[in-house]
Every structure is written in C-alpha cells, then in structure tokens.
Amino acid sequence: LDRGLVKAPLLVQTVFGILGGIGTHPEDVAHMKRTADRLFGDQYVWSVLGAGRSQMQIAAMSAAQGGSVRVGLEDSLWLSKGILAESNAQQVLKARQVLEGLSVEVATPDEAREILQLKGGNQANF
C-alpha cells in the first residue's frame, strides 16, 4: 500500500484448520484479526475460511468481530457434527442462519460481488 503497488481496500482472507497451519481456537482467530488491524489499519476487508468441522464456528467468530465469511464444500464437507452437507447452497443457508442469529446483516449476492469487485458469472467469458 505504501509503495502504491496495490489499492485499498485489500481483501485479507485468513484460513483456519488446515493441517500445518493456524488452528481453530477463538484466540487464533482473534490473533489474525489483531495482526491484520496492526498491518493494514482500516484499509482492508477481513474474511475467514474455516476448514473442516470448524467451518461454522469460525464463521461465527469472524462475524462477531466484524469480518466476512466464506463457506462451501471446497472448504468443508460437513454441515454440522456428523452430518455431511449435500450442497454449497445448504452450507450457505446454514451460515446465513448462524449470522442472522448473531444479528449480523448478510450481503446479497450482488452486494457480495460488489464487495469482492467481481463482475458476475453472466459476464464471464468461460
């Protein structure tokens, strides 16, 4: 940012629960948020990815600290303890329920595309 090589806001995606990486303890999540705050101040958007069985807990911890969340079968096959997810849509619905239970406003698909500066699948040439 200081050298002008990239423009704010940065998207900082922190990943939790990957073998050999940072764990899924609430202090791990708080540490990564504090580190991003120290490095980037208010010039970033924070999002988390919780791999495996901790996906929804990590999502809730992020939301409670003002962060965004990412869920999907590429990150976890589980919907909840002992229950395999049948689809990405099922995980998104579960995440929405968790976030709304925390009184967190959930972005619409169009709002999410704007936040992430994506053009949308109907405008991609693949």
Set out the residue ranges of the language-model regions.
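Catalytic alpha/beta core domains of metabolic enzymes, predominantly
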Residues: 1-73
